[in-house]
């Protein structure tokens, strides 16, 4: 029985980036041998065991054979006669098919080290095409390692395109699509994930609401990049610089979905695209089973991001309506998330990437002014019921009106 460190741990150590999880392959052993050593079996579909001391995963070397549709349609064979090379051959990319023995020797039958050095994402074998989830995984790796200069090998990109055209992506469950997408949104360059999916024709299958935005023009005066799809990915890239939160990044991705519904005869203008986008965000999130907090922020951003761009022109009562809609009194973090997403929208335009966004500080200060009005004082004044609400609103409007007279910020239109 021999054990080897495999997969991401070997890859990341060779890239000299932090190793998060360590996975092991066991060659030449039966399940009974591992359980006798105190290992606990956790895998249902194939033998995976937890080390009793480290709690790291140890999997018996195995092969996989396509037996049905989708990413679950595989028959697994795990036995002592399965070799390390056979186990590595079933993996998706050459950079993930490198093993390291106990003495530090690298076992690299598919030239993964060379691809690491060349910064290339390349599939191990044609078996890659049997698992549609791998299209998303490669797109995610492209996003994760984009800052290191990685690109997808042409033959791998072509195979991904063939897979997208085959209809197999339809077999992916909503949970798996969202899981890969969520990981991609957490990467340093999440916009690359969606660009890769578009390049291999998978975006229209999995995210038609986003794919539709490409080719939809916006006024060149405000959007020199013109194409709404390009603007969307630029906005996502800026959002990734501003916040690590998936909620903010997903909202940036979805902020202009409504523009995809504008009739062509009205191009390049998109009046009312905010409310139209809310329905599309709702449909997208329902289909992919996006968590409710992520969905709720994306809907708010879709509806109100244009209003935030013009915040210094809003009347006190309109500001309060915005605060109420966002439920900022109970969820103040939402306001900051919306500000960051709106800033990403304003800066996600050719030539505007480094521009300031004074609307953000203006809105932060406006909330501080309104929130400083004491609820306790209103209650202590003897008012009851709806009269408390009305008086609180009146005092907040008055405070905002007085504060607004001291403010003067330049206005840009996104």
From Swiss-Prot:
Enzyme Commission number(s) from the entry: 2.7.7.72, 3.1.3.-, 3.1.4.-
Required cofactor(s): Mg(2+); Ni(2+)
CDD domains in the record: HDc (cd00077), NT_ClassII-CCAase (cd05398)
SUPFAM superfamilies, alphabetized: Nucleotidyltransferase (SSF81301), Poly A polymerase C-terminal region-like (SSF81891)
Binding of Mg(2+), residues: 21, 23
Matches recorded under PROSITE patterns: HD (PS51831)
Annotated ATP binding sites: 8, 11, 91, 137, 140
Binding site for CTP: 8, 11, 91, 137, 140
SMART domains (UniProt xref): HDc
Domain of life: Bacteria
UniProt domain HD: residue ranges: 228-329
GO molecular function: ATP binding; CCA tRNA nucleotidyltransferase activity; cyclic-nucleotide phosphodiesterase activity; magnesium ion binding; phosphatase activity; tRNA binding
Cofactor annotation remark: Magnesium is required for nucleotidyltransferase activity.
Matches recorded under InterPro entries: CCA_bact (IPR012006), HD/PDEase_dom (IPR003607), HD_domain (IPR006674), NT_sf (IPR043519), PolA_pol_head_dom (IPR002646), PolyA_RNA-bd (IPR032828), tRNA_CCA-adding_enzyme (IPR050124)
Catalytic activity: a tRNA precursor + 2 CTP + ATP = a tRNA with a 3' CCA end + 3 diphosphate; a tRNA with a 3' CCA end + 2 CTP + ATP = a tRNA with a 3' CCACCA end + 3 diphosphate
Keywords, comma-separated and alphabetical: ATP-binding, Hydrolase, Magnesium, Metal-binding, Multifunctional enzyme, Nickel, Nucleotide-binding, Nucleotidyltransferase, RNA repair, RNA-binding, Transferase, tRNA processing
Biological processes per GO annotation: RNA repair; tRNA 3'-terminal CCA addition
Note: A single active site specifically recognizes both ATP and CTP and is responsible for their addition.
Family classification: Belongs to the tRNA nucleotidyltransferase/poly(A) polymerase family. Bacterial CCA-adding enzyme type 1 subfamily.
Cited function: Catalyzes the addition and repair of the essential 3'-terminal CCA sequence in tRNAs without using a nucleic acid template. Adds these three nucleotides in the order of C, C, and A to the tRNA nucleotide-73, using CTP and ATP as substrates and producing inorganic pyrophosphate. tRNA 3'-terminal CCA addition is required both for tRNA processing and repair. Also involved in tRNA surveillance by mediating tandem CCA addition to generate a CCACCA at the 3' terminus of unstable tRNAs. While stable tRNAs receive only 3'-terminal CCA, unstable tRNAs are marked with CCACCA and rapidly degraded.
Cited NCBIfam families: PRK10885.1
Domain notes: Comprises two domains: an N-terminal domain containing the nucleotidyltransferase activity and a C-terminal HD domain associated with both phosphodiesterase and phosphatase activities.
Record note on quaternary structure: Monomer. Can also form homodimers and oligomers.
Protein name: Multifunctional CCA protein
């Amino acid at each position: 029985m021999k054990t080897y460190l495999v997969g991401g741990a070997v890859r990341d150590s060779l890239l000299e980036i932090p190793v998060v999880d360590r996975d092991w392959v066991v060659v030449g052993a039966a399940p009974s041998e591992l359980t006798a050593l105190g290992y606990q079996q956790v895998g249902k579909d194939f033998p995976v065991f937890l080390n009793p001391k480290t709690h790291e995963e140890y999997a018996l070397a195995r092969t996989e054979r396509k037996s049905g549709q989708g990413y679950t349609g595989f028959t697994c064979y795990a036995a002592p006669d399965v070799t390390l090379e056979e186990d590595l051959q079933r993996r998706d990319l050459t950079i993930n098919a490198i093993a390291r023995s106990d003495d530090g020797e690298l076992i690299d039958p598919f030239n993964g080290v060379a691809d690491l050095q060349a910064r290339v994402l390349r599939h191990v074998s044609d078996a890659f095409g049997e698992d549609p989830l791998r299209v998303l995984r490669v797109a995610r790796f492209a996003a994760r390692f984009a800052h290191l200069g990685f690109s997808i090998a042409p033959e791998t990109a072509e195979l991904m395109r063939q897979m997208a055209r085959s209809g197999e992506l339809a077999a992916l469950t909503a949970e798996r699509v969202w899981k890969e997408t969520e990981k991609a949104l957490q990467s340093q360059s999440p916009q690359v994930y969606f660009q890769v999916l578009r390049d291999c024709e998978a975006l229209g299958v999995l995210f038609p609401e986003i794919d539709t935005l490409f080719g939809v023009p916006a006024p060149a005066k405000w959007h020199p990049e013109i194409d709404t799809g390009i603007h969307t990915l630029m906005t996502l890239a800026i959002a990734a610089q501003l916040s690590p939160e998936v909620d903010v990044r997903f909202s940036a991705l979805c902020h202009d979905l409504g523009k995809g519904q504008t009739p062509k005869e009205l191009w390049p203008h998109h009046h009312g695209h905010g409310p139209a986008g809310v329905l599309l965000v709702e449909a997208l999130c329902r289909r992919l089973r996006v968590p409710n907090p992520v969905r709720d922020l994306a809907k708010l951003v879709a509806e109100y991001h244009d209003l935030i761009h013009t915040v210094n022109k809003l009347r006190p009562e309109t500001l309060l309506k915005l605060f109420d809609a966002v439920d900022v009194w109970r969820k103040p973090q939402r306001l900051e998330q919306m500000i960051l997403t709106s800033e990403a929208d304003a800066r996600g335009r050719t030539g505007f990437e480094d521009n300031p966004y004074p609307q953000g500080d203006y809105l932060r200060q406006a909330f501080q002014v309104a929130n400083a009005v004491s609820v306790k004082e209103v209650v202590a004044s003897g008012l009851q019921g709806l009269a408390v609400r009305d008086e609180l609103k009146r005092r907040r409007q008055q405070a905002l009106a007085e504060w607004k007279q001291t403010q003067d910020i330049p206005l840009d239109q996104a």
